[in-house]
Amino acid sequence: MNAARVLSRLTRKPLDTPIAAVMRPCEIRAFVELVKLKQGSTDNVVLIGIDCYGAYSNTDYSRITASSKGAESTLAFYRSVLSGNGTAAEGTDISVACKSCEHPAAPNADITIGLFGTNMEESLLFLPNTEKGGQILHVLGLSEKADEPAGRQRVIAELVSERVAYRDRMFESTAAVVSDVDKLMSYLGNCVNCYNCRVACPVCYCRECVFTTDVFDHEPFQYFRWAKRKGMIKMPTDTVFYHLTRMAHMSTACIGCGQCSNACPNGVPVMELFRTVAHAVQSAFNYSAGASFEEDPPLSVFQEREFSEVTGGKD
């Protein structure tokens, strides 16, 4: 589960007890979107981000750690990465979502635990990104560890460049296999309407989803009518419509964490489809989901002049 969902539950109402939340960059970005959607608050919360080299899928991680303790596997992973041996372990690499993530650091956290460009065996880097974060590091006596080492930004830039190249190849290949309705239906063919992707999505926050209401609780005769009209009918129905609806609702807020694919029992590559669409939508609005608490979500504001290619440039 993306930790933003958990933090949202804890902060929807005022807190008397302060919370320190240690989160990956994608989780912080998801929480940023939830705060802007009034589904959480940063009051009495300290966001601690950690540089992220990526994560395995749930099933891969369970298999890799089955023969060892989780902490040992985590340390082995970081030693492998920091020694230049990559992220693969036992023939398994990090998830596609992580390979295509261009936000491996968390500048929107109060405090960043820096791993890029550091020797983790010798020390940890603590970077204050906000006044709140700086005050906490000062109280803890960690202010002297807040100097960014030379080469850190170069390491981050190289990793981002590698991931952006992978991401763009993913966009291209995904767009090719969903370029028409028939291809999209085939792409989503294994979907069984379990709605796990909706439940796992950190920014899908509706208390009641239209797809679990009577709107899609069709009468038996309707199925036979549709089958007679078309000559056949695929069961379960509305699978493509469900994903199209989710994309319409969530594409401006998708942060590409990959939990949708993680939760799918049938291996539908949901993340690849949603990220491809979300990237196009967010680019159209010049918006990056989760990048800033101050930037309003695109559909929450009105611009007098935008999309001139649609309006013909008319005022």
Over which residues does each language-model region extend?
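Iron-sulfur-associated redox domains of electron-transfer enzymes in respiratory
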Residues: 1-184
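Local cysteine-cluster metal-coordination motifs and their immediate loop/turn environment
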Residues: 24-29, 93-105, 189-210, 251-267
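Alpha-helix boundary/capping residues
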Residues: 35-38, 191, 280
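Short secondary-structure junctions and interdomain/linker hinges
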Residues: 38, 105-108, 194-199, 284, ...
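Generic hydrophobic/packing signal
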Residues: 47, 59, 193-196, 203, ...
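Internal hydrophobic scaffold segments of catalytic domains
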Residues: 122-131, 137-140, 194-215
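Ferredoxin-type iron-sulfur electron-transfer modules in oxidoreductases and energy-metabolism complexes
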Residues: 163-189, 206-315
